[in-house]
């Protein structure tokens, strides 16, 4: 839930800061912006300093962006939390920023979020350092590596599902977060001691809760608690790293790739702080997004009984074959689930978990006759593109059959695009398919209440995390 007292406090602090800055320096800094004002995209900058922050936070953020696109077009300006922004809602513009001219737009995140994850994390950087990190991160997350994780992900899926049965009400999103966290731990560390894993989970959960709170570093605030938990996480990870260095053989995973990395092209091996920052960054990228997708799949299948039966039929054939031959899912089988795979793709489009990307112009950039000034934030709006009827007819309808043919280029970017596209997308798709396989072949469920409404934190999930009941079924 939104803490409006924290919002008021946060905005008040920034307004006071802005007024002080304006009276000291404002007059000297306005001339160049006024000179170029006629070139700026259309849009509204809202109130002084806070801009349209209140409008964004007081409504569905997707409605905020869609309404402004309808009013101003596919490129428009606004101001959020004191930052002037240019929003881009066309495939061509997204590709321009993320691929064609990516060197002109650097990744940008609020400093408060960098403090919680760690300033050396991969998605805060670009250039040679980013390329070096991406190579290390992708190695244990490529298809050749993750196929060996299938038995362990199956075990985690079945264990999670079994813990939900009995007819009690389950917060599906919270449970899926637990599952995706376990998969993330597996991909990073291999198998961790239970006590260490619990300490890691406890402190990570505190950081997670504070990540999307307003960054007020005062006693009792979620942000202060998150900063304290982040320090503890660093110590826990240092101890894990020390113990793993003492082992003669390291378990395969992201941490072992970091520890085994050699000096390359002027880059020294990563130090412990850099390793910790990137481990926490990967956990953040892996947990909430995958959990959100899985929660939406459960809702969409529940709301579309005929589609659910089609998915069940497809998965039952695989399940029966494996029962007869007494083995689990294989990599080849996960590549041959066309109906289920289209359900996943349509869920990624409909829910658009990653609604936009954050970039900042490193120089004045001209695009289609408009100026994007240096220092302005730039946000390609993936959700607006995914819900554009020009590319996806009847976009509010859940229709996996639309993916029987490939979408037009640059109209479907569920994992981002360019050099900063999600490096763990293959692992995410694999765990989603495995969980869905066991869900539909061994369990049934019902959503409690209407199941309507969306909450943002910041990723979109069904309101209340999708309350549901689960029961085990007898597969035949």
Curated annotation (Swiss-Prot):
A GO CC annotation given for this chain: membrane
UniProt-listed GO biological process terms: abscisic acid catabolic process; pollination; response to abscisic acid; response to auxin; response to water deprivation
The protein's enzyme class: oxidoreductase
UniProt KW keywords: Heme, Iron, Membrane, Metal-binding, Monooxygenase, Oxidoreductase, Transmembrane, Transmembrane helix
Binding site for heme: 422
Pathway: Plant hormone degradation; abscisic acid degradation
Location of the protein in the cell: Membrane
Membrane topology: Single-pass membrane protein
Tissue specificity: Expressed in ovaries (specifically in ovules and placenta), sepals, petals and pedicels.
GO MF entries: (+)-abscisic acid 8'-hydroxylase activity; heme binding; iron ion binding
Necessary cofactors: heme
Signal sequence region: none
Sequence intervals crossing the membrane: 5-25
Pfam families: p450 (PF00067)
Up-regulation conditions: Accumulates strongly after pollination in whole ovaries. Induced by auxin (4-Cl-IAA) treatment and abscisic acid (ABA). First transiently repressed (1 day after treatment) and later induced (2 days after treatment) by abscisic acid (ABA) and dehydration.
E.C. code: 1.14.14.137
Reactions performed catalytically: 2-cis-(+)-abscisate + reduced [NADPH--hemoprotein reductase] + O2 = (+)-8'-hydroxyabscisate + oxidized [NADPH--hemoprotein reductase] + H2O + H(+)
Similarity comment: family membership: Belongs to the cytochrome P450 family.
UniProt function note: Involved in the oxidative degradation of abscisic acid, especially in pollinated ovaries.
Name of the featured protein: Abscisic acid 8'-hydroxylase CYP707A1
Gene expressing this chain: CYP707A1
């Amino acid at each position: 839930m939104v803490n409006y007292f924290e919002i008021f406090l946060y905005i008040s602090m920034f307004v006071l800061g802005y007024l002080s800055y304006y009276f000291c320096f404002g007059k000297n800094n306005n001339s160049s912006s006024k000179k170029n004002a006629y070139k700026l995209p259309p849009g509204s900058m809202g109130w002084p300093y806070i801009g349209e922050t209140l409008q964004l936070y007081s409504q569905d953020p997707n409605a905020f962006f869609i309404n402004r696109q309808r009013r101003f077009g596919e490129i428009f300006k606004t101001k959020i939390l004191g930052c002037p922004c240019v929003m881009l809602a066309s495939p061509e513009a997204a590709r321009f920023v993320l691929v064609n001219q990516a060197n002109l737009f650097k990744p940008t995140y609020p400093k408060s979020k960098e403090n919680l994850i760690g300033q050396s994390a991969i998605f805060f950087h670009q250039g040679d350092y980013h390329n070096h990190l991406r190579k290390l991160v992708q190695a244990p997350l490529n298809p050749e590596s993750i196929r060996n994780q299938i038995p362990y992900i199956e075990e985690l899926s079945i264990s999670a599902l079994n813990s939900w049965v009995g007819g009690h009400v389950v917060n599906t999103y919270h449970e899926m977060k637990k599952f995706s966290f376990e998969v993330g731990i597996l991909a990073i560390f291999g198998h961790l001691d239970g006590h260490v894993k619990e300490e890691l989970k406890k402190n990570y959960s505190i950081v997670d809760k504070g990540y999307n709170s307003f960054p007020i570093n005062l006693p009792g605030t979620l942000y202060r608690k998150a900063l304290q938990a982040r320090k503890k996480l660093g110590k826990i990870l240092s101890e894990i790293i020390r113990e793993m260095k003492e082992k003669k053989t390291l378990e395969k995973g992201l941490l072992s790739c970091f520890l085994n990395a050699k000096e390359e092209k002027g880059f020294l091996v990563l130090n412990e702080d850099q390793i910790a920052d990137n481990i926490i960054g990967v956990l953040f990228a892996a947990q909430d997004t995958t959990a959100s997708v899985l929660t939406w799949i459960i809702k969409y299948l529940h709301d579309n009984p005929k589609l659910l039966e089609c998915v069940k039929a497809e998965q039952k054939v695989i399940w029966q074959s494996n029962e007869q031959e007494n083995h689990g899912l294989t990599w080849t089988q996960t590549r041959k689930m066309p109906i289920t795979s289209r359900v996943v793709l349509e869920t990624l489009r409909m829910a658009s978990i990653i609604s936009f990307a954050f970039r900042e112009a490193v120089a004045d950039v001209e695009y289609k006759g408009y100026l994007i000034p240096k220092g302005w934030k730039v946000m390609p709006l993936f959700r607006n593109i995914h819900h554009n009827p020009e590319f996806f007819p009847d976009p509010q309808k859940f229709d996996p059959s639309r993916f029987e043919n490939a979408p037009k280029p640059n109209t479907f970017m569920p994992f981002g695009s360019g050099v900063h596209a999600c490096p763990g997308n293959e692992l995410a798709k694999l765990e989603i398919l495995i969980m869905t396989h066991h869900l539909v072949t061994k369990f049934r469920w019902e959503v409690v209440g209407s199941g309507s409404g969306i909450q943002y934190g910041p990723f979109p999930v069904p309101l209340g995390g999708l309350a549901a009941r689960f029961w085990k079924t007898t597969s035949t």
